[in-house]
Amino acid sequence: MIRLIVLGHSSDDKGTQLESLTASILSSLKYTDIIMNVVGKGGNELDVVAKYSTPHISGDLIHPVVCECKAYKSKVDITDWPKFLGKFYTARLEDSKAMGIMIALSGANGNVVGAYDGILKKNVPISLVSGDDLLKSLASVFKMPPYDIIRKKVSYYTDDHIHS
């Protein structure tokens, strides 16, 4: 697995860049009405919101989507997870078709992954995206070559070990 990093002047700058990358991924997947930095009801700060349409016999079903983007150097821990769930379930109270996505640049710790796995077993429309899944999405959006090709090109210029 490649470790993805976002370079920026501050943690806010890095977060904004990850939000922009998330918006680009959603746009490439045909999500619509993508807006960054929305303050929802009750003062909930939502990093990215969008809508996703699925065909239905009586017309398209529109699913609101709330995204939380974490550009931390370390893995997302259990203190961030309930905050995201609160935002997600608030959106579900407004529209039962709402979906939630947490983008975790450096992944999530075992407690978060365990909690996420438990929620998935209940068929809740929520996603935790990090690591290879995030890289694949970005590679698709930005037409990046596969990791092996990047590694070969870099090794042409240096003998230093490439950490993955």
What are these regions (language model features)?
Residues M1-S164:
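Mixed-charge (Asp/Glu-Lys/Arg
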